[in-house]
Amino acid sequence: MTPGKFITLEGGEGVGKSTNVDFVVSRLRARGLKVVATREPGGTAFGEAVREIFLRQDTVRPEAELLLLFAARVHHLREVIEPALRRGDWVVCDRFTDASYAYQGAGRGIAPGVIDFLRDWIQAGLRPDLTLLLDAPVDTGLKRAHQRSGPDRLEREDSAFFARVREGYLALARAEPGRIRVIDADRPLALVQTAIATQVDSLLAGHV
């Protein structure tokens, strides 16, 4: 059986990841593909428990953040992502390991080598086939996020933190342009989704 493909959507707060996960899933299903939609932290009972701690606990040290996320990622990979890919399903995930580099690495100051070690140990070479990095100015994203709901623990960080996160993401995209495609999310949704559709269709055609 041909393994499925793994698509991730990344970006800072308020860039539209959840909306566009739904869009990507719908586009793939319209092609007759079996698709698993999931998120990080989350995707499993363990992961959702970590998500609650991660977003609601008043204080979580950077090292604890990183280790919690990778603990949740172990369950997510073994219970959801890897079995789906082996079945030939496609997986669409709202955030994955790139978020650890952007938030805990660039944002919190944890050395990339520490994250490299955890990634290589836990993922054993598994990488997304395509990552859609939704990018918007920090102020725009935070305004959208705060309009959506009350701020969670992460969203209460200052704009300097999110500027570091954004630059961390863009640095990843510069380092891996073949996998990570930057999508300008500071424009009408229809235009954002046209750009996303182009990248997804390219993967479907085997060109990514």
UniProtKB/Swiss-Prot annotation:
User: Which InterPro entries does the entry mention?
Assistant: P-loop_NTPase, Thymidylate_kin-like_dom, Thymidylate_kinase
Which amino acid positions bind ATP, per UniProt? G11, G12, E13, G14, V15, G16, K17, S18
Which GO molecular function entries does the Swiss-Prot or TrEMBL record give? Answer: ATP binding; dTMP kinase activity
Catalysed reactions listed for this entry: dTMP + ATP = dTDP + ADP
| Family assignment from sequence similarity | Belongs to the thymidylate kinase family.
Q: What exactly does this protein do?
A: Phosphorylation of dTMP to form dTDP in both de novo and salvage pathways of dTTP synthesis.
Write down what this protein is called: Thymidylate kinase
Q: Which source organism? A: Methylococcus capsulatus (strain ATCC 33009 / NCIMB 11132 / Bath)
- Gene name tied to this protein: tmk
